[in-house]
Every structure is written in C-alpha cells, then in structure tokens.
Amino acid sequence: MKLKFCGFTSIKDVTAASQLPIDAIGFIHYEKSKRHQTITQIKKLASAVPDHIDKVCVVVNPDLTTIEHVLSNTPINTIQLHGTESIDFIQEIKKKYSSIKITKALAADENIIQNINKYKGFVDLFIIDTPSVSYGGTGQTYDWTILKNIKDIPYLIAGGINTENIQTVNQFKLSHQGFDLASGIEVNGRKDIEKMTAIVNIVKGDRENE
C-alpha cells in the first residue's frame, strides 16, 4: 500500500515525515487553500525531501506558465491536477516534461467511472477525493462503496482518511493502491508525528525505523 502525506507547510514537518516509509509528500500551490505555499516556499520544503520519496505539487486549473515555474524552480517530480484540466493540457505538460508524473484528482460522485475513462491513459495515478467546491482538503469522507466498481486502475483514496476510519476502508476490499492524507495527520492544523506514525503502522506495518 502506498502512502502520500499532503499539505506540508514547514521544514520541521517535512523532515519528520521523511523519516517514515511513505511514498510521496505533497505541497499545495493554490491560493484559496489554507495550506497554500508559494513556489519559493515549495522549493525550500521539497528540497528537504529525500530522493526516494516523490515530491508532489498540487495545483488547481493552472496554466502552463504556472507548471513551468514550478518545475523550473523546484525539485518537484509529480504534478497533481485537482481541477477540471483538459486532456490537451495534460498532453502539453507530458510533451514538454516527459519525465514528470501526472496525478489526477477526481471527485467520488456519480460521474467517477466516466471521468476515470476520460483521463485513463493520460495520467499516471488517480486520487479519488470527497466531492467539494474547494477542491479537496475538507477532512470530509464519502461513501467508499462507490469505489467497488473501480478495478485495474491505479488510485489512492483521499477524503477524510484518518487513524479511526482507515481500517474500515480496508474492509471493503477495494482495488486501491493506497491512501492520500492531509487533515487526518494533523492536530490544530499542523502535521502531527504521532498521527503520521500511526497511519504508517496501520498501512505498512511497524516499519518506521527501517
């Protein structure tokens, strides 16, 4: 199972998370988000992430110039598109930055299968999140049974995942590759090492010291 921890805003938290056996660390470049970081801040934060952990920049309906600024000025190796980006736009990114991974976030609503089929073949990974006008980060969950028909597609489950409900999700025997957490590893809006460690232990076993 893969783990992505997202929404980091401090070097201290990035350093702590990087000691755990997680797969990706995310930074949000979207001014309407409470976890928004400038490109300068993302450069500093992402530089503290070791090479074996993917460095993800989350953007919402960006233009190509924004993508260029992120990729030219930071060590980011994955772009997570969290809006209504077009296939043509994704192909533009891939054409210019062939080594960059593209993740597409989708809302867990009645159109989920249709939207997966739309983007399938153009992105490397899906994030399936709680439907929200604020494009994620709400801490709210959704009916995970909607994911039962999604098979043979690489995706992470996001949306209010925490230490209390993550084992419930696993009882549904879904085909997900892992989880994406932000609010579920926070206390009072700040990343919490105890919660991060607890999630790692649940998902990957007691391996944080390896």
UniProtKB/Swiss-Prot annotation:
Pfam families on file: PRAI
GO molecular function ontology, one term from the record: phosphoribosylanthranilate isomerase activity
Keywords associated with the record: Amino-acid biosynthesis, Aromatic amino acid biosynthesis, Isomerase, Tryptophan biosynthesis
EC number: 5.3.1.24
GO annotation (BP), single: L-tryptophan biosynthetic process
Paired cysteines (S-S): none
Pathway assignment: Amino-acid biosynthesis; L-tryptophan biosynthesis; L-tryptophan from chorismate: step 3/5
Catalytic function, reaction form: N-(5-phospho-beta-D-ribosyl)anthranilate = 1-(2-carboxyphenylamino)-1-deoxy-D-ribulose 5-phosphate
InterPro entries in the cross-refs: Aldolase_TIM, PRAI_dom, RibuloseP-bd_barrel, TrpF_fam
Family: Belongs to the TrpF family.
Name of the protein in its database record: N-(5'-phosphoribosyl)anthranilate isomerase
Classification of source organism: Bacteria, Bacillati, Bacillota, Bacilli, Bacillales
